[in-house]
């Protein structure tokens, strides 16, 4: 349950009423507002003499709490401010030379951010698992050289010490989208979070994952749609372009789309990216490699520089049309 004082002057009275009720609650500051959060139900709250406050069952992500769209700042980039943001880079960081070449080229071609995996959640333990801290250091080095803010996936709370101060935005991948311990932990930090949907999540379940972060006081959340698993195997996952407008209607949070993973094959990535932009995505996350066929992970879906050049030109043109 979320209780929002209608006026800053009413905050002490709301707090006193909750304390007098012996109800367990906590105060959170989010988007310039003071909120009181309790695990009690709306029925319980009805009997508390709270005046001049809005009571909602849940949904810090919803437009009931914040009507205007949120934008999230990552380095010198604003996601959700009206300009299409494109994050590009390899699925996995493989070497200093590889990452520097990719970082310089994607910036030259118009990318706003550098993506790259240092800790890799792979389906089998025998696949390349990433370079770990070495990869993080490489990301920071290329970021400092190119000026591109970075986004990289965090898999475990214990790894946060490696990311802090080195990576600008933390990605929570599909497999961790309901890792509630990790989500709560990130809610206690101010770091921007790119939250992907789980392979079998409904939109409501995914938004509730965002709620774990928001309810800790961290409002810097971007929702990233990466498709869901279905019976169809022509593509790696099913990308429902209807998910983006539904998210924009139900939530004030910025929406990113990852067309690389649902495509599974590079020839489909641009088309899915165009569909995401046409449906209202604020951001795209694209896998790009200097030698895709030799990539250590997700080789089939990574674009080469020519493919990325064509994609980014076309999505920028489309964004100008759809606004």
Positions of PLM-derived features:
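N-terminal amphipathic alpha-helix/helix-capping segment at the start of soluble metabolic enzymes
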Residues: 5, 57-87, 320-323
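N-terminal small/glycine-rich loop or linker at the start of catalytic domains
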Residues: 73-91, 122-125, 248-257
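Catalytic alpha/beta core domains of metabolic enzymes, predominantly
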Residues: 74, 189-288
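Active-site mouth loops of central-metabolism enzymes
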Residues: 84-101, 125-129, 149-153, 174, ...
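Hydrophobic faces of well-ordered beta-strands that scaffold small-molecule active sites
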Residues: 84-90, 112-116, 150-152, 170-172, ...
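Glycine-rich, proline-tolerant flexible connector loops at the mouths of alpha/beta enzymes
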Residues: 115-133, 290-300
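Alpha-helix-loop-beta-strand connector modules within alpha/beta enzyme cores
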Residues: 128-152, 186-192, 241-256, 301-323
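Catalytic beta/alpha-barrel core
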Residues: 131, 148-156, 168-181, 191-203, ...
């Amino acid at each position: 349950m979320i209780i929002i004082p209608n006026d800053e002057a009413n905050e002490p009275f709301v707090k006193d009423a909750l304390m007098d009720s012996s109800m367990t609650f906590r105060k959170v500051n989010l988007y310039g507002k003071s909120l009181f959060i309790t695990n009690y139900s709306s029925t319980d709250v009805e009997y508390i003499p709270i005046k001049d406050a809005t009571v909602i069952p849940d949904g810090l992500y919803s437009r009931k709490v914040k009507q205007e769209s949120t934008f999230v700042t990552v380095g010198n980039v604003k996601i959700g401010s009206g300009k299409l943001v494109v994050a590009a880079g390899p699925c996995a960081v493989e070497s200093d030379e590889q990452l520097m070449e990719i970082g310089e080229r994607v910036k030259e071609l118009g990318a706003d951010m550098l993506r790259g995996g240092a800790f890799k959640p792979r389906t089998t333990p025998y696949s390349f698992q990433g370079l770990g801290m070495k990869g993080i250091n490489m990301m920071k080095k290329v970021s400092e050289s190119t000026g591109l803010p970075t986004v990289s996936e965090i898999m475990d709370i214990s790894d946060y010490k490696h990311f802090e101060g080195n990576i600008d935005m933390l990605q929570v991948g599909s497999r961790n989208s309901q890792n509630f311990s990790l989500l709560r932990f990130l809610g206690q930090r101010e770091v921007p979070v790119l939250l992907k949907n789980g392979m079998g999540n409904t939109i409501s379940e995914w938004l509730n994952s965002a709620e774990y972060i928001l309810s800790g006081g961290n409002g810097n959340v971007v929702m990233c749609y990466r498709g869901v698993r279905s019976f169809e195997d022509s593509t790696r996952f099913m990308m429902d372009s209807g998910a983006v407008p539904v998210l924009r209607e139900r939530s004030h949070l910025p929406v990113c789309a990852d067309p690389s993973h649902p495509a599974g094959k590079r020839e489909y990535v641009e088309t899915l990216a165009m569909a995401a932009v046409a449906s209202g995505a604020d951001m795209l996350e694209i896998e790009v490699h200097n030698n895709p066929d030799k990539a250590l992970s997700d080789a089939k879906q990574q674009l080469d520089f020519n493919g990325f050049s064509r994609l980014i030109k076309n999505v920028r043109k489309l964004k100008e049309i759809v606004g």
